[in-house]
Amino acid sequence: MPTIQQLIRNPREPKRTRTKTPALKACPQRRGVCTRVYTTTPKKPNSALRKVAKVRMTSGFESLCYIPGEGHNLQEHSVVLIRGGRVKDLPGVRYHIVRGALDTQPVKNRKQRRSHYGAKKPK
C-alpha cells in the first residue's frame, strides 16, 4: 500500500482498454481481398454450416470474416468491405463483410431489414 506522498510523486496509471477490432485500426470499415472462402461449423449447442472468408486487409492484417445473409457470390480474390462485429458461436470471427459493397452482391429477395444486406426496395 503506497503512501499519499508516493502517489503524488508517481500517480496510478489507468488500465488501457483493448480494442475488440484491432485489424480495423480505429476505422469504421476497411477494404480487403478474400484469400479463402469456406464453410465452418459453430460451437457446441448450435449446428449449421456458416459461411466464412479469410480476408487480407489494407491494414496488413489477415483475419476471418463472416458472410451474412442467404447465398453469396464471393470467391478467392474478391474485394470486400469489412466492418466490426463478432459472431458469438464462431471462435476467431470478429468481423463481418458488408453486403452490397465493392464485389459483394446484396441478398436477393430480401423484404425486411434490407439495409443490413444491401438490398434495394422492391417495386
From Swiss-Prot:
Pfam families: Ribosom_S12_S23. The gene is rpsL. It comes from the Bacteria. PROSITE patterns: RIBOSOMAL_S12. The modification 3-methylthioaspartic acid is found at residue 89. This is Small ribosomal subunit protein uS12. With S4 and S5 plays an important role in translational accuracy. Interacts with and stabilizes bases of the 16S rRNA that are involved in tRNA selection in the A site and with the mRNA backbone. Located at the interface of the 30S and 50S subunits, it traverses the body of the 30S subunit contacting proteins on the other side and probably holding the rRNA structure together. The combined cluster of proteins S8, S12 and S17 appears to hold together the shoulder and platform of the 30S subunit. Belongs to the universal ribosomal protein uS12 family. Part of the 30S ribosomal subunit. Contacts proteins S8 and S17. May interact with IF1 in the 30S initiation complex. InterPro entries: NA-bd_OB-fold, Ribosomal_uS12, Ribosomal_uS12_bac. One of its GO terms (cellular component) is small ribosomal subunit. Residues 1-28, 104-123 are annotated as: Disordered. Residues 108-123 have a biased composition (Basic residues). It comes from Hyphomonas neptunium (strain ATCC 15444).
